[in-house]
Amino acid sequence: MEHIGKKVTVFGSFVVDLMGRTPHLPAAGETVKGTVFKMGPGGKGFNQGVAAHKAGADVTMVTKLGQDAFADIALNTMNELHMDTGRVLYSDTTETGCALIMVDENSSQNEIVVILGACNTITDQEVDSLEDLVGQSEYLLTQLETNVSSVERIVDTAYRKGVKVILNTAPV
């Protein structure tokens, strides 16, 4: 892959996707036997980082993880993709997020419950510690799968530093 040389900071979510396929989505109170289960990396922020990496950008991923097996999945995946993980934050009190995804194998309709976990606990002080990183970036990519106050603060920092901001308003 050609390296485009753009320095991109991605500020956002990482969750582990837990996906099950079923013959139909369950009604309230119903249990449905699934046919396939898959587990893998996800989250809108992480997905932005993967897309930027595949486009050839130099990506630094900023998210917050717990101290758990899902955090290991996050770091292993990011390292395999050669993303800079030096600014990943950690929580001692909250677990890494996950998404519970049910997919109807006939219609492909889905239902998703996302538990944002640690990436929803990013503090003002943690955002402030990223000012130099943001200032060295050409782009800041972010979305609304972390606490909104942290997104507002990091976007304000980027604007002050003259950094281009791409805000995906998902999951709204």
What are these regions (language model features)?
Residues E2-F14, K64, N76-Y90, M102-V172:
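Ribokinase/PfkB-type carbohydrate-kinase core domain
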Residues D92-T94:
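Short, glycine-/polar-rich solvent-exposed loops and beta-turns at beta-strand/coil boundaries
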Residues M1-K64, A69-M83:
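Glycine-rich phosphate/adenosyl-contacting loop at the front of the ribokinase-like
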Residues T96-I101:
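Short alpha-helix plus adjacent loop in nuclease-associated cores
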